[in-house]
Every structure is written in C-alpha cells, then in structure tokens.
From Swiss-Prot:
A motif (Essential for actin pedestal formation) lies at residues 452-454. This is Translocated intimin receptor Tir. Phosphorylated by host kinases. The keyword Secreted applies. Multifunctional protein that is required for efficient pedestal formation in host epithelial cells during infection. The extracellular region acts as a receptor for bacterial intimin, allowing the bacterium to attach tightly to the host-cell surface. Simultaneously, the intracellular region initiates a signaling cascade in the host cell, which leads to actin polymerization and formation of actin pedestals at the sites of bacterial adhesion. The lineage of its organism: Bacteria, Pseudomonadati, Pseudomonadota, Gammaproteobacteria, Enterobacterales.
Length: 551
C-alpha cells in the first residue's frame, strides 16, 4: 500500500490533505509490523487526533478500536499535525502559517509590498492569477529577518526530502547560488563542450529483515569536445580575413580606375637644332625675297655700257639677311628651352599627384586590409590551437562507483513496518557521504554530478562529524556565509537565518521516532497531542529566528 495519498481514507470524507511520500515510496508497515497492535497509554485528551482506519491493514489484523479514540474524527480536517504510520493510524503533520501562505499565494516566487493602509501583503501568482495575502507582524518580521538586502522578494523551496514543509529563502540567494554553482561547473565559461552518452545506473540490494544493505551507483559519462567550427571566435577570425581580402581587391580596383593616370614621358626639343633650323629657314626666305628686287643685286656693265644684274646680292643686303637669320635662330632656341621646361613641369605635376593618391589609397586600403588578414589569421590559429589543446582533456570517459554498506539490526518493535523507509532514508544520507569523498577525488572531471542542495535533509542537527563537511562541489561556494547556510544544516554552528523553514520536521523525523521506539506512540510524542505542542519542534529546533509557528 503506497504511502502518500491520505485522501483515500473513507472515514474522513476526503478532508485529509495528501501527505508527502517517504523516500522509499513503498509501504514498509506490512512487513513484520502489521500484526502488532500499536498501544497508547496517554490520557484521552492526548489522543484526540488519532483514529483507526477502516478498510486498512489494521482491520485484517484486529477489528477492535482502541478505547477513547473517535471513530469519525471531524477534527482531522483542521488539525495541525499529520504523519502516516500504515499500521492502522493516521496523525496530521505539522503545518504552520508558512505552509498556509504557500498554499494561498502559490508555490513559486512572491514579493512583499506595503499597502495604502500601512499593512504589508505577500503577492504571488497562483494558477495564472495574482493573489495577495495580508501578513501579520510576526510573519512580516520573520521574512524581513532573512531578507538582508531588503529587496522584498522570496522563493518557496519546500518539499525537501519528502518532508512536505514549505520553506522560504530570499530570491537573491537562489540567483547567487545558481551563478556560483554554474561558475564552479564551468570556471572558464567556455560553453564549447557538450556532454554526450551519459549513462547512469543505480542498483540497490536490501533485505526486509534488516540485514546488510548495499547500494551501488555507477556513472559512466563520455564527453567530447565540440568542433572548432562551432566556436564564434573562429568565424569572427574568418570574417576578418574575408574582409581584408575584399579590401585588397577594392583598393586595387580603385587605384586602377579612379586615380590620376600615369603621365607620359615629356617631349623635349634640342635648342641648338631648333636655332639652326630657324636660322637656315629665315636666311633662305630672306634671300629669295631679296632676289625679287633687282635693286638688291649687284650690277655689271657690259661692253656696250648697259647695266646687267650680276645675280649676287649686295653686301649690305646679305648682312641684313644674316642678322635677321641669327635673330630667328636665337628666338627658336629660347622657345625650345621654354617648351621643354613646360613639358617637364606638366609631367612632374601629374606624376606627383598620382604618387600622392597611391600613397593615400595604399595606406588606408592595403594597410587596413593587411591588418585584418593578419589579425584574422592569428585569431583562427589561436582558436584552433586552443581547441586542439583542450580536446584531449574533454574526451574522457569516467566511471564512478559509489558503494554504501549499512548494518541494520532487525527487531520486533510495534512499528517495525517503517524500518525499510528509515533504511532508505539513512542509505541516501550515507550515499551522500560516499559521493563527497568521490567528488574530492575527481574534482577536475567535467562529468562530476552536482548534489541538489535541497535533496537530503533528514539528518538531525547534531549528526556525526563525518556528515558535517560539505560536498566538494560546494567548497568554494560555501566560503560565502550567506550561501553556505543553504546547504549546511548539520553541526553545532548556529544557522544565520538565510533560509526559513524546518527541514528536519514533518513526516520523516516523526516517522523515525515511531519506528525506532519499541513503545510506538508511548515515548517522545508529546507534540502529537490535541494541545499546541509538536513532536517535530521538540526533535529538531527551527534553524531560523522569528516566531516558532512561522517555520
């Protein structure tokens, strides 16, 4: 018969709320303890919350009702304690204002805001609807005691280990704890490796009579490094190289089309040749013109006495022609010199302009493009080298085996049926110790598992010294006093009040008292009465300040 849904009790008209299951998830009461009647020697007033269950295991054993216990317990719906002892009786487990608040405003995050009338309300979201609940002074003080940053935002962290108790911690602590755990798991924050082929196997071997229990947990993890192509830095480097190549091409095209063309060699003229040519041309031209006029020629007289042109120019005419020819040659020489100078100047100007444009375009285009190519090449090379260096460390296959051996002595107690549940709970605690030692050995393994900080809370506050140390994965995280209290519920150190709630209370601790006590409900159960006391508050004190009821 599974433990958990007390709503199947036909005698309570389905008013009993569901109780959280024990870690074993099985009914151990039917093994060895179902045939023994649980006796209660207390007064009638201290047994008002007890009622025999009809149609249960107790009916098959003994149909008698214990004297003084009501057959139809109408008070069960409003009682404040509940535990399931499947030998035929039910007791409500402890529920305080924090549990009620959790039920009213939803089981997620909530905030505290001051209302217009000066009161404070807890505002949460339940079923998609915003719900607010007015807090009394004790509840407000208890929440403010753990909210050191005074941010007014909290998170419910209840249901620890099957205890069923609502617990509250500041939302900032949850965010900080998550960030620190992620930083511990991935200190370099590469995000490039992905674990694959994870195979986790757990084998449990136990006996109902309380013999040796052995729990073997084998974890095989094979992780491989991702390809360098999945690294964004590699593609950034490739993009830089491509941009550099494009810049080189654009610079070359610009220089070929948009720049000043290269000037041709300047055309020069020899001044002497120009002067000689001009002088000869001028002399010939003037000589021809002089011969046209007979007066410019010499005259010879024949025998008869007639004047006949001799065909020679007069000396003064020849002298004038020679003078004018020299002047023309000198002018041609000067013109040739000036023409050569102008051509050279044009060439020099165009060449200088082209060189300036080339230097400017080369400095900007080629230099920047070359820098991009070199930088991209270096980045791609470094990224590839880092991936190759990290790849052997990540391509590891680790096999971790946890073995826990626990000695349980059998006994014929009245509540022997709960022994299996206690054994499963203690086994989970010892498994935590073995995982602590294994984690310290494989601290550098990327496949190390993180133990849920809210997983195992059934141990008492004054447990053995071997359980006081934290898991290795929280060594650095626990250095922060604000966060270490979230994990550490063992030892003699006082909790500083960063986490509100009582992890040791509820169905686990009370069930342990019932099953480990040969007298059943006889001893140590002062809290399971109709008066205001609570056994769980007697067994484990609340670790946080504030009112005792608001836990």
């Amino acid at each position: 018969m599974p433990i958990g849904n007390l709503g199947n009790n036909v005698n309570s008209n389905n008013l009993i709320p569901p109780a959280p299951p024990l870690p074993s998830q099985t009914d151990g009461a039917s093994r060895g303890g179902a045939g023994q009647l649980i006796n209660s020697t207390g007064a009638l007033g201290s047994r008002l919350l007890f009622s025999p269950l009809r149609n249960s295991i107790a009916d098959s054993v003994d149909s008698r009702d214990i004297p003084g216990l009501p057959v139809h317990p109408s008070r069960l719906a409003t009682a404040t304690s509940e535990i399931c002892l499947l030998g035929g009786f039910e007791v409500l487990h402890d529920k305080g204002p924090l549990d009620t608040l959790n039920k009213q405003i939803g089981a997620s995050a909530f905030r505290i805001e001051q209302q217009s009338d000066g009161s404070y309300a807890a505002i949460g979201e339940k079923n998609g609807v915003e719900v607010s609940v007015i807090l009394n002074s004790q509840e407000l003080q208890s929440l403010q005691a753990i909210d050191i940053e005074d941010k007014g935002r909290f998170v419910f962290t209840g249901g620890r280990g099957g205890g069923g108790h609502s617990m509250v911690t500041p939302a900032s602590d949850i965010a900080e704890a998550r960030a620190k755990i992620l930083a511990k798991l991935d200190p370099n924050n590469h995000g490039g490796s992905q674990a694959r082929n994870v195979d986790t196997r757990s084998v449990g071997v136990g006996s109902a009579s309380g013999m040796d229990d052995s729990v073997v947990s084998e974890t095989r993890t094979s992780s491989t490094a991702s390809s360098v192509r999945s690294d964004p830095k590699f593609w950034v480097s490739i993009g830089a190289i491509a941009a550099g190549l494009a810049g080189l091409a654009a610079t070359g095209i610009t220089q070929a089309l948009a720049l000043t063309p290269e000037p041709d060699d300047p055309t020069t003229t020899d001044p002497e040749q120009a002067a000689s040519a001009a002088e000869s041309a001028t002399r010939d031209q003037l000589t021809q013109e002089a011969f046209k006029n007979p007066e410019n020629q010499k005259v010879s007289i024949d025998e008869i006495g007639n004047s006949i042109p001799s065909g020679e120019l007069k000396d003064d005419v020849v002298a004038k022609i020679e003078e004018q020819a020299k002047e023309a040659g000198e002018a041609a020489r000067q013109q040739a010199v000036e023409s050569n100078a102008q051509a050279q100047q044009r060439y020099d100007t165009q060449y200088a302009r082209r060189q300036e444009e080339l230097e400017l375009s080369s400095g900007i285009g080629y230099s920047l493009s070359s820098a991009l190519i070199v930088g991209g090449g270096i980045g791609a090379g470094v990224t590839t080298a880092l991936h190759r260096r990290n790849q052997p460390a990540e391509q590891t296959t680790t096999t971790t085996t946890h073995t826990v051996v626990q000695q349980q002595t059998g006994g014929n107690t009245p509540a022997q049926g709960g022994t299996d549940a206690i054994r499963a709970e203690d086994t989970s605690l010892n498994r935590r110790d073995s995982q602590r030692s294994t984690a310290s050995t494989h601290w550098s393994d990327t496949s190390s598992a993180v133990v849920n900080p809210y997983a195992e809370v059934g141990e008492a506050r004054n447990s053995s010294p071997a359980r006081q140390a934290e898991e290795h994965i929280y060594d650095e995280v626990a250095a922060d006093p604000n966060y270490s209290v979230i994990q550490n519920f063992s030892g003699n150190n006082q909790v500083t009040g960063r986490l509100m709630g009582t992890p040791g209370q509820g169905i686990q601790s009370t069930y342990a008292i019932l099953t480990n006590n040969s007298a059943g409900l006889r001893l140590g159960m002062g809290g399971l009465t109709g008066s205001g006391g609570s056994a769980v508050n007697t067994a484990n004190a609340a670790p946080t300040p504030g009112p005792g009821r608001f836990v």
